[in-house]
Amino acid sequence: MDERLVSGSALGGEAAFEPTLRPQYLHEYIGQDKVKENLQVFIEAAKLREETLDHVLLYGPPGLGKTTLAAIIANEMGVKMRATSGPALERPGDLAALLTSLEPGDVLFIDEIHRLPRTVEEVLYPAMEDYCLDITVGKGPEARSLRLDLPPFTLVGATTRAGALSAPLRDRFGVISRLEYYQVDQLAQIIERAAAILHIIINNEAALELARRARGTPRIANRLLRRVRDFAQVRGDGEITLPLAVEALERLQVDRLGLDHIDHKLLLAIIEKFAGGPVGLETMAAVIGEEAQTIEEVYEPYLLQIGLLQRTPRGRVATPAAYAHLGMEVPKR
């Protein structure tokens, strides 16, 4: 799968760049108002009681700010954050080393927590519940169990697939919050904030145009801003105006709904080769040359969300809105 400009996941090089644009405190964080307001209450209450914050699970599509919120929680609590990911914790010893290095009150952030191996996850249960670590020393008949006390800490887990979490792990989180896609006006604010940090001149009309094509996702909005800046510096006078933004986005093959060439390829395959559907997932994967899992987990969610695609018991169907967006007539059935 090629790296897509409109992918919600971080692309190569962005992990080092994104921290410069991230807000540090809740009052700087744009959008997700309900989540933000609730977190503010929970954080203030924990500080008043001089306790650690309950464990927090953040879930939702990629690129919406889960990692940013984890860092904000640590900043608001006045503690350090240690960050890792589910796939990085391959053995129980990997997690044990992290847990024993924490200081009282620290935030441990585990991204992609649904990908924790089961053996590692089981070590996490007593750590979350009782702030202790059960380890086995020795092998065979001489093996014995030791219990190590851990400092109180807050686990912040992030996942794009909350349903993939086991019930025992999910039940140990005191705070569970879903992050939603952003509104266009919120994304425009995020773009204007990033532009100010990066010393980019952009007018409000251009910011709104980028926001409309950012698929409700701040990471994509910031990525489009940086790419359009290149066009402004080379093809213009450095300022991002509406005409320049439109031209740059068209050259980048990001249309007015935020669809790229792969989205178009998928919709056109359903319409032109299967008369609009229904078509099975495996068949569609073979036709466009992608894995079925990639289509289902990466390409389809946004098309479903904006009403261009439907999943039916018989397969995928292109909606009348998809025909209209592509400038095609809906066939009479």
From Swiss-Prot:
Which family does the record claim for this protein?
Belongs to the RuvB family.
Q: Where is this region: Head domain (RuvB-H)?
A: 256-333
Self-association state and partner proteins as the record states: Homohexamer. Forms an RuvA(8)-RuvB(12)-Holliday junction (HJ) complex. HJ DNA is sandwiched between 2 RuvA tetramers; dsDNA enters through RuvA and exits via RuvB. An RuvB hexamer assembles on each DNA strand where it exits the tetramer. Each RuvB hexamer is contacted by two RuvA subunits (via domain III) on 2 adjacent RuvB subunits; this complex drives branch migration. In the full resolvosome a probable DNA-RuvA(4)-RuvB(12)-RuvC(2) complex forms which resolves the HJ.
Q: Name one Pfam family in it.
A: RuvB_C
What protein does this entry describe? Holliday junction branch migration complex subunit RuvB
Where is it predominantly found? cytoplasm
Keywords annotated in UniProt: ATP-binding, Cytoplasm, DNA damage, DNA recombination, DNA repair, DNA-binding, Hydrolase, Nucleotide-binding
**EC class name:** hydrolase
Q: What EC designation does it have?
A: 3.6.4.-
Role according to the record: The RuvA-RuvB-RuvC complex processes Holliday junction (HJ) DNA during genetic recombination and DNA repair, while the RuvA-RuvB complex plays an important role in the rescue of blocked DNA replication forks via replication fork reversal (RFR). RuvA specifically binds to HJ cruciform DNA, conferring on it an open structure. The RuvB hexamer acts as an ATP-dependent pump, pulling dsDNA into and through the RuvAB complex. RuvB forms 2 homohexamers on either side of HJ DNA bound by 1 or 2 RuvA tetramers; 4 subunits per hexamer contact DNA at a time.
Task: State where DNA binds.
Answer: 311, 316
| Residues binding Mg(2+) | 67
Q: Where is this region: Large ATPase domain (RuvB-L)?
A: 1-182
> Where is this protein localized, as stated in its record?
Cytoplasm
Ligand binding (ATP): 21-22, 63, 66-68, 129-131, 172, 182, 219
NCBIfam families hit by this protein: PRK00080.1 (NF000868), ruvB (TIGR00635)
| GO MF annotations, alphabetized | ATP binding; ATP hydrolysis activity; four-way junction DNA binding; four-way junction helicase activity
What reaction is this protein's catalytic activity?
A: ATP + H2O = ADP + phosphate + H(+)
Q: Where is region (Small ATPAse domain (RuvB-S)) located?
A: 183-253
Q: Which GO terms describe its biological process?
A: DNA recombination; DNA repair
Q: What is known of its domains?
A: Has 3 domains, the large (RuvB-L) and small ATPase (RuvB-S) domains and the C-terminal head (RuvB-H) domain. The head domain binds DNA, while the ATPase domains jointly bind ATP, ADP or are empty depending on the state of the subunit in the translocation cycle. During a single DNA translocation step the structure of each domain remains the same, but their relative positions change.
Its gene is ruvB
Which Gene Ontology terms of cellular component type are present?
cytoplasm; Holliday junction resolvase complex
The record ties this protein, via InterPro entries, to: AAA+_ATPase, AAA_lid_4, DNA_helicase_Holl-junc_RuvB, P-loop_NTPase, RuvB-like_N, RuvB_C, WH-like_DNA-bd_sf, WH_DNA-bd_sf
